């Protein structure tokens, strides 16, 4: 009888222990493995070099569930996370506190897709990049305008923008300026294949010169189909030792990027970028050219045109001419169309 009672009590005790263990497992799972994001969406927090454990917790509070944050704090205390905080951009999502903490502790941050756009100026480029990466626009500008930095990569302050090829690249948020520039140099070399480099040389250009002409072509039109024809016209002028007389270079020199008319008084503006005043290519690109414009220069159309003028129908394409007389007729038609629309 006594043995039977003991067996029942033992069985009952095992059930209680099993229940407690089961509840413990469920609680542990809830705290360690349930989604950490309080919104149910993937969120990102940015840990800076000067963040401490309190500022990290403050950032986590904004995007984390209370129970997950509690679990994160317990692990942080056990593993002395406050002494080893790693900067970066970290994901707060469907993963639980355990995996999230491991990512924070080991510096396993989420990468960022950074698109290098076909922009006009170094300032525009620096602004785009600084919105995605940790360093500031001013810090990047200081590097890009430093003679020592430009020389290190084989460029001048005027043509350093030629190192950047439009594309989307992956970076970590805490990437340094030095690492960023090395990556851009590597991607530039990858873009300039043997075939592209040979075509540039066969056309009489260095890579930087090809990028410079491509930047003018890019400014002239958004019509990619017309780009090789425009490139051919400018190459014809270069071969004949004629000034390029490219309107976009005057706009660049004056900073009047949105001008629809080029006034005669502007043509004498003293700037090495003014191709009405100075023969040859300007000292560097007037924007980061799109890939289509670069390839247009490398694969330009052979023809006899020396002049072009925007069409009076405002289609974005151009009338081409072999003689100045023909060009004058085209220019007059375009000028009248501007006046008719009240465009200054």
PLM region descriptions:
Residues 1-11:
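N-terminal Lys/Arg-rich, disordered targeting/topogenic segments
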Residues 3, 15-17, 42-43:
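Non-catalytic interaction surface on structured domains
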Residues 10-13, 327:
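Hydrophobic, aromatic-rich alpha-helical transmembrane segments
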Residues 13-17, 33, 251:
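A generic signature of intrinsically disordered, low-complexity regions enriched in glycine/proline
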Residues 37-192:
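Signal peptide-directed extracytoplasmic domains
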Residues 127, 133-138, 149-344:
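Bacterial extracytoplasmic/cell-wall-associated proteins, especially those involved in peptidoglycan
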């Amino acid at each position: 009888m006594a043995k039977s009672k003991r067996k029942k009590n033992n069985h009952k005790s095992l059930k209680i222990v099993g229940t407690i263990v089961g509840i413990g497992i469920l609680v542990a799972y809830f705290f360690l493995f349930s989604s950490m994001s309080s919104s149910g969406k993937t969120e990102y927090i940015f840990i800076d070099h000067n963040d401490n454990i309190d500022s990290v917790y403050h950032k986590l509070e904004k995007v984390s569930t209370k129970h997950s944050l509690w679990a994160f704090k317990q692990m942080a205390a056990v593993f002395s996370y406050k002494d080893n905080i790693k900067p970066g951009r970290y994901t707060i999502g469907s993963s639980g506190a355990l995996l999230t903490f491991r990512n924070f502790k080991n510096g396993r941050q989420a990468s960022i897709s950074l698109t290098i756009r076909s922009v006009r100026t170094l300032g525009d480029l620096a602004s785009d990049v600084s919105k995605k990466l940790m360093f500031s626009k001013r810090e990047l500008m200081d590097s890009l305008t430093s003679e020592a930095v430009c020389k290190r990569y084989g460029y001048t302050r005027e043509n350093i923008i030629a190192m950047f090829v439009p594309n989307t690249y992956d970076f970590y948020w805490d990437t340094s300026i030095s690492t960023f520039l090395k990556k851009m140099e590597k991607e530039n070399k990858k873009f300039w294949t043997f075939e592209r480099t040979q075509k540039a040389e066969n056309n009489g250009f260095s890579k930087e010169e090809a990028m410079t002409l491509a930047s003018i072509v890019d400014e002239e039109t958004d019509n990619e189909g017309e780009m090789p024809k425009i490139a051919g016209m400018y190459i014809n002028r270069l071969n004949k030792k004629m000034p390029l007389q490219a309107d976009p270079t005057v706009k660049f020199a004056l900073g009047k990027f949105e001008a629809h008319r080029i006034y005669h008084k502007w043509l004498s503006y003293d700037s090495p970028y003014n191709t009405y005043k100075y023969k040859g290519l300007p000292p560097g690109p007037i924007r980061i050219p799109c890939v289509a414009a670069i390839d247009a220069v490398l694969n330009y159309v052979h023809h006899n045109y020396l002049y072009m003028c925007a069409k009076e129908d405002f289609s974005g394409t151009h009338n081409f001419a072999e003689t100045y007389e023909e060009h004058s007729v085209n220019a007059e038609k375009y000028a009248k169309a501007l006046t008719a629309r009240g465009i200054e």
